[in-house]
Amino acid sequence: VSHNNFLRF
């Protein structure tokens, strides 16, 4: 899981 993915909301 990319923890950076939530920043791309």
Curated annotation (Swiss-Prot):
One of the GO biological process terms: neuropeptide signaling pathway
Source superkingdom: Eukaryota
Phenylalanine amide: residues carrying this PTM: 9
Keywords: Amidation, Neuropeptide, Secreted
GO CC, alphabetical: extracellular region
Keyword match Secreted: yes
Subcellular location per the Swiss-Prot or TrEMBL entry: Secreted
UniProt similarity note: Belongs to the FARP (FMRFamide related peptide) family.
Name of the protein in its database record: FMRFamide-like neuropeptide FLP8
